[in-house]
Regions:
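Catalytic cores of eukaryotic secretory-pathway lumenal/extracellular enzymes that build
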Residues: 1-201
């Protein structure tokens, strides 16, 4: 939250919907990180939780008609003016697609001396695209495909068949049109979202 607010071009326009599944209620701490942004917060004891999809369905219930949705995992770093960049990319795609979704698996990072460090060389000539993982095959005991992010030498948008639950940016109405299935625990989450998003345009 702190990084998102610090690097946003318009932090006052941000609304965070947080479903906190830790033992202690951290609303005051998280609210103090929000600055001019708003916080909608639900605390659930880890004993009472039912998995990531259930938590994300609860997070979707915090939606109040905002223009855009950015769904991320809690382990995330942001680029400067990330909010304006996402809106600009989405707006450009809107000219060719009625309901564009920007989605990928973001770079991982590590902490060194208390500071986050991305150890991958980031190129301004490639786009990070979701592709099926080569070590994945459908089987009777495993009906879930795995995907990974790969660099493609283009800076133009690449159509995809998959969405990443840990980074998904689109119109806010996605919340109402493609609600989360709270009965899924983890596997199948992204395939369910991708198929339903496709069939809804």
């Amino acid at each position: 939250i702190k990084d998102a607010v610090a690097k946003a071009k318009a932090p006052e326009s941000l609304v965070f919907g947080v479903v906190d599944q830790t033992p202690e209620n951290r609303r005051p701490t998280l609210a103090s990180l929000c600055g001019p942004a708003k916080l909608r917060y639900v605390h659930v004891s880890p004993i009472e939780t039912r998995g990531v999809c259930w938590a994300r369905s609860v997070a979707f219930s915090l939606y109040q008609g905002e223009d855009f949705l950015l769904q991320i995992d809690s382990h995330m770093l942001f680029e400067q003016d990330w909010d304006a960049q996402l809106i600009a990319q989405w707006t450009a795609l809107k000219a060719t697609c009625d309901k564009p979704i920007l989605s990928t698996y973001p770079y991982g990072f590590e902490f060194e001396e208390g500071q986050p460090v991305v150890k991958i060389n980031i190129s301004d000539q490639t786009t990070l695209v979701l592709r099926p993982h080569p070590e994945t095959a459908l089987a009777d005991d495993n009906a879930t495909l795995r995907f990974r992010a790969e660099h493609v030498f283009t800076r133009t948008p690449v159509p995809g068949c998959h969405v990443a639950g840990g980074f998904l940016f689109t119109e806010g109405r996605f919340v109402d049109e493609i609600p989360y299935d709270p009965r899924l625990y983890f596997h199948g989450e992204e395939q369910s979202l991708a198929v339903r998003a496709y069939t809804h345009g």
